[in-house]
């Protein structure tokens, strides 16, 4: 009963956070005459994204003299439609989304984590007898979305390279992937290193990593070409300044951006073009 009460309280608190964030005029400097849209790829639930990003954007916005409207699409495909139409002004997106956004709308990456590189993983239940990727042939594999970079595109490309046919089942979020494997709805699932690390111990303990991909520069914050260089620079400086105090470091840890660094498309994301992942893309609504 106590556990149920705690769960209900947590859900209620998250709902309040979502509602308050959604109803706020903007996050950051309230006197700013310009409100920038800030979209976050929905790898997690909207409640979790609002809980972690809202306080960070509030502080960064105040420091930088900027104000943001935090937006979270219901699904990754919906997020992609908005991105490839050029709607978000600031956006936190996966590395291959950064490639597409640069090619389609000239978005420029601004900063990303410098230490925790991104890897795609395939997980199975901890008690699964499966030892090799070959054993997944013809099986249902949970993936968050068709165009999730490390959790889907890299996994499907790796399986295709090995000539292992799988049945991908798209379940919207990384959290859903891990739980579908635990619940035996799929024999394996695709995720990324840090979303598994962020799961509660009860989930992590029931899973085993079967495969891990090469490491890549992780998700960046990128900006639409309409965002002035001065606004980009103020945002970057404010984000880097968060590393200087404990509260700021906790905010960065919450979004898996503990050691932010300035990044460029040419150096950090253009090399992904050579992976030729476009053959695995599924784009809708364009």
Label the model's feature ranges.
Residues 1-5:
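N-terminal secretory signal peptides that target proteins for export/translocation
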Residues 9-20:
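Bacterial N-terminal signal peptides
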Residues 26-95:
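Extracytoplasmic small-molecule ligand-binding "clamshell" domains
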Residues 33-43, 115-124, 202-243, 253-275:
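Periplasmic-binding protein-like
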Residues 34-43, 49, 134-151:
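Short loop->beta-strand "edge-of-pocket" segments that line small-molecule binding or catalytic clefts
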Residues 77-91, 104-105, 134, 175-190, ...:
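Short helices/loops that flank or line small-molecule/ion binding pockets
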Residues 100-124:
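Glycine/small-residue-rich loop that forms an oxyanion/phosphate-binding "nest" at active or ligand-binding sites
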Residues 128, 139-230, 237:
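Pocket-lining segment of extracytoplasmic ligand-binding domains
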């Amino acid at each position: 009963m106590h556990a149920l009460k705690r769960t209900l309280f947590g859900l209620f608190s998250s709902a309040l956070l979502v509602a308050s964030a959604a109803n706020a005029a903007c996050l950051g400097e309230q006197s700013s005459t310009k409100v920038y849209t800030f979209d976050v790829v929905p790898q997690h639930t909207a409640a979790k994204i609002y809980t972690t990003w809202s306080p960070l954007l509030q502080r960064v916005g105040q420091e930088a003299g900027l104000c943001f409207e935090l937006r979270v699409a219901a699904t990754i495909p919906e997020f992609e439609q908005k991105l490839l139409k050029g709607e978000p002004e600031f956006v936190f997106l996966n590395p291959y989304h950064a490639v597409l956004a640069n090619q389609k709308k000239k978005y420029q990456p601004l900063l990303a984590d410098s230490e925790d590189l991104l890897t795609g993983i395939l997980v199975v239940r901890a008690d699964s007898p499966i030892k090799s990727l070959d054993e997944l042939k013809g099986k249902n594999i949970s993936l968050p979305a068709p165009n999730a970079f490390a959790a889907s595109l890299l996994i499907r490309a790796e399986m295709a390279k090995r000539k292992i046919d799988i049945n991908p089942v798209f379940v919207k979020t990384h959290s859903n992937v891990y739980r579908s494997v635990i619940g035996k709805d799929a024999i394996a699932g695709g995720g990324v290193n840090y979303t598994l690390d962020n799961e509660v111990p009860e989930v992590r303990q029931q899973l085993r990593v079967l495969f891990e991909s090469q490491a890549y520069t992780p998700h960046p914050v990128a900006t639409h070409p309409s965002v002035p260089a001065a606004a980009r620079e103020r945002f970057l400086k404010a984000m880097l300044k968060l590393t200087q105090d404990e509260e700021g470091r906790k905010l960065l840890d919450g979004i898996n951006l503990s050691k932010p660094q300035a990044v460029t498309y040419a150096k950090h994301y253009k090399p992904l073009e050579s992976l030729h992942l476009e053959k695995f893309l599924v784009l809708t609504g364009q």
